[in-house]
Structure formats: C-alpha cells, structure tokens
C-alpha cells in the first residue's frame, strides 16, 4: 500500500454481552489497509501477569458479581418439607462457609487447599446434584483460609459438615483438633438459606470482597464458579451492521437506562466511546419479550436450570 493512500476503519460487526442486569454493546472496527494501531491497552498489560497473587482485580470483581447475578437470576423457589415437623420451608439460595480448623504446626499451602476444595465440590456434584455455584476464598485474622460458597442447590447442613470433616480427616487436618477435643467433628461449616434475593448480588459481592487479600502464599484463583455459569458468561452475540437496528429497537424504552463507557481523556482532552450499556432490573427483561435478545436470555436461563445444551445461534447476520 502506498504511504499516501488513506487508511481508515470500518465497522465489521457489533458485539453484545448479556448479563441479568446489563446489556453491553461494543462496536468492532478494522483498518481497511491493515492495522496501524500500536497502542498497548491496559488489558493487554494485565494479561502478562498470570498469577492473581491472592487479590481480586477490578475486572475480577466485576466477573464475580456477574457470576452471582446469573446464579440469582436462574435460581428458582423450592419447597422443602421437614421430615420431623412436616413444615414446608421455602428455599432459593444457600450460603455455605467451609473452614479449616487451627493446625498445630502446618500452614495449608495452595496445592493442598485446592485439592481439598475440589474434592468437596466433586463429592457434592455426585451425591447432592450440586448445580450452579460460586466460591470465594478468604483469610481469617489468624491466617487460616476459609471458603464462601453460594449455590442454588439445597444441601442439608449435616451433610455439608460431615462431608467436609471427612475430607479434612483424610488429609490429616483434624489431628490437632482430635488431640485437643478427642473427636473428629469440629464445627467447621456454616450454612444459611437466602430467600430474599432482590439485592443479594450486590450484598454478596461486597461481603465476599471485603477482605481482598488472601495470602502471599496463595497465588492461585481466589474465586471461581461452576462450569455452566462460566459458559454462560463467555457467550457473546455477534450482530452484523445490517441487523443492528433490529436488535437495538426493543432497547429504546424509557424504562431501560442508558450509559456510555468512555476512555480517559487523552492529552488533547478527547475521550472515545468504548461501550454502550443498557441497564436493567431482572423484571425489565419482560419489556424485551419477543426480541432476539430476550430469546437468548431465556435460553441461557433454561440452560442454567436444566441439563439442556445451548442450541441458540449467537451470530446474527443479514438473511
């Protein structure tokens, strides 16, 4: 290409990231005569650092919040009957805390801690049909690690405690407790049912990130979620320029708030559009009923609630 030939960008497609409380739209542009853009973004710099160093970045906090929002949006009310009293209990979400009791001389390292956690999750997937969940690691004041787990699956409090203590015992982590109290049944778990979930995502993110630093010894992921939630969060709707008006039309509703995400001003004071956000409450999705966006959201919720596989086309092009 001649150095005098004009180079410019054209829009190739639009991408939509669907979340229960926001729809994020970005415009994808490419240079007509090749990419002259040499600017390193902050995101690219962050990708160089693989270890989390026991901390949650701003981006990780947003992902944690997103995973909790999907868990809340897809969870259904369940009726549980007590075998002792025949009383019907309402259930929607469980908040579980798993703790490792004090050790005499041992500090639990990352590798062993991961093994214990994964063993418990595998056990519950097999015997309790553990479905959707989000977990986050935190540190006690005495440097002991514990795990918070949010799940839409009911697990009896005694099964939670018995299974966790069994795994701890098999890994030699109850010997000090037995030496002091002559038993292998410490109060190492806590479980609460959350029925009022209107603001649970915001509350749980605040609660689960209040102690952001875990430990210099722990360089692994400090949070994660079930594979189905992870899969849903990775889905992106790709829309061709010819279809963009059709997709955007249902979002032009006064009840749906709109917000632009801009870059920080450059040396000339100019900011550039990065993304457009359409802010919703969960009940606002009914306003989009009949639209392609609504059908995708409904499909994602059904996927999280059942064993059904995703079958919807995420590439919307001109027919």
What are these regions (language model features)?
Residues 1-143, 154-319:
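Right-hand nucleic-acid polymerase module
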Residues 146:
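Calcium-binding loop positions in Ca2+-binding modules
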């Amino acid at each position: 290409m001649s150095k005098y030939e004009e180079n410019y960008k054209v829009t190739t497609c639009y991408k939509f990231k669907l979340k229960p409380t926001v729809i994020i739209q970005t415009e994808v542009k490419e240079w007509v005569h090749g990419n002259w853009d040499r600017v390193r973004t902050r995101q690219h710099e962050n990708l160089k650092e693989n270890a989390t160093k026991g901390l949650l970045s701003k981006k990780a906090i947003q992902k944690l919040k997103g995973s909790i929002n999907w868990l809340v949006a897809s969870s259904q009310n369940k009726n549980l009957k007590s075998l002792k009293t025949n009383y019907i209990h309402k259930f929607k979400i469980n908040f579980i805390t798993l703790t490792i009791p004090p050790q005499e001389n041992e500090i639990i390292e990352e590798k062993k801690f991961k093994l214990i956690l994964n063993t418990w999750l595998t056990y519950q997937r097999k015997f309790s049909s553990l479905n959707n969940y989000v977990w986050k690691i935190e540190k006690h004041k005495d440097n002991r690690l514990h795990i918070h787990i949010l799940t839409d699956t009911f697990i009896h409090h005694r099964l939670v405690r018995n299974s966790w203590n069994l795994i701890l015992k098999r890994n030699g982590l109850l010997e000090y407790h037995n030496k002091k109290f002559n038993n292998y049944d410490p109060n190492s778990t806590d479980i609460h049912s959350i029925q009022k979930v209107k603001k649970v995502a915001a509350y749980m993110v605040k609660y689960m990130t209040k102690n952001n630093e875990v430990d210099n010894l722990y360089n692994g992921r400090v949070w994660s979620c079930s594979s189905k939630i992870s899969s849903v969060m990775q889905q992106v709707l790709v829309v061709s320029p010819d279809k963009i008006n059709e997709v955007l039309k249902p979002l032009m509703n006064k009840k749906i708030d709109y917000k632009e995400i801009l870059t920080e001003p450059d040396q000339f004071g100019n900011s550039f559009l990065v993304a457009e956000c359409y802010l919703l409450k969960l009940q606002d999705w009914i306003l989009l009923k009949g639209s392609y966006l609504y059908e995708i959201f409904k499909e994602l919720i059904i996927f999280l609630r059942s064993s059904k596989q995703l079958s919807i086309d995420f590439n919307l092009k001109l027919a």
